[in-house]
Amino acid sequence: MAQNTRTGDLTSGPMLQKIILFSLPLAASSILQLLFNAADVVVVGRFAGSTALAAVGSNGALINLLVNLFVGLSLGANVVAARCFGAKDDEGVHNTVQTSVTLGLVSGFLLAVVGFFAARVLLELMSCPEDVIGLSTLYLKIYFIGMPMTMLYNFSSALLRAVGDTRRPLFCLAVAGLINVVLNLVFVILFSMSVAGVALATIISQTVSACMVTALLVKEKGPLHLDLGHLGFHAGALGQILRIGLPAGLQSTVFSLSNVVIQSAVNSFGSIVVAGNSAASNLEGFVYTAMNAFAQAAVTFTSQNMGARRYDNLDRVMRNCLLCAIVTGLVLGGGASLLGEQLLHFYSSDEVVVTAGLARMHIICTTYLLCGCMDVLASCLRGRGYSVLPMVVSLVGSCLLRLVWIATIFRLFHTTTMLYLSYPVSWILTTLVHLACLLVVRHKMKNRPKLSIA
């Protein structure tokens, strides 16, 4: 039976309860996505050795660098669809759906070509260790072959989030996650395929999740219905998606560029530190995605309320999302830091790898709530229609600062501790500037109650 699209009203009722109910399936979905990579890392680390573990883990920053621009565009699709839905503009919702899915497929094919043919060169630019680069290149090439399906899932699930539906994408990912884990074990243990096996398992599972979520849109009877026979770009919808999504994507891309520079600095310490950093980064990802669910809630709730002209709800959305992100960061980040040694042993039995991972986790996990606050405030600005502003603030406050830190402080004190401290320092400064910008925007909106959302 088709889903009634008019069930995702995020503009009325108990806001905190709605935010939590919206965010929990979203957090679970993001965690399942992380489990794809975690399953790769754990199986490879346990059954293929530390070199294979470093090969898989060292690709994360580079993958994010190439992918995040287009993931930002899916955020634009989410904002535009949510605004149209809040304004009860059915034609606008439908045009956004057709445009978004088309954009997702085109983006995926572009990424597949670039990622496949440039893999080795990009890894060499990152100073990937010689004993790792061959396996890293193989993993990266196979991974990017599946990029059209990854982008299709991102854009399709963004459209479902726009109308408050976060539960059905969770089910799709749960099915795909089980497939991924089973295939990892089969390919690596039974067929001894090492990194090629985990990459192949990942793209098969991502294809399953993409097809399932897209099928949900096809079965819709309301404005969210996807007509596969009439895919294409609608100029108005595409323009709005690009206006919101490009700044967000550029911000994420430059963030990833700074992380690539940091990964290159990590690579300078050798494959043991690379392996420990990879395992720690994967664990930290679970904390981040749990917090980031509330940032995604902030942009969707803010966008719908802007579309419905319920400006009185905007402050409540911001306060509730900040509260949830802070509590999540404190509980999960603190817990991960305290249990870091035990958790890292899931990834590697090598004590020196575990020690290297702990050095990162004790700094990042204990301060991760700052990152959660930064993301929620940026999402509130985007939902209000200001996408360039948080991009500029983040690029200067986080990315540029990290690059300067590595070129100065890290060069003087060449230790992993000094390298990892660049994260919390950048989060503090960026959060403070985002807050100041949001207060200014809030004041402008109060003085212009008839503010246009176009």
Segments and roles (model prediction):
Residues 74, 142-161, 169-177, 198-213, ...:
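Short runs within selected transmembrane alpha-helices of multi-pass transporters and secretion channels
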Residues 38-41, 113, 121, 155-159, ...:
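Alpha-helical transmembrane segments of multipass membrane proteins
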Residues 21-40, 142, 176, 205-209, ...:
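Transmembrane helical elements of multi-pass membrane transporters/channels
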Residues 53-113, 150-169, 263, 276-340, ...:
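Small-residue-rich hydrophobic transmembrane alpha-helices
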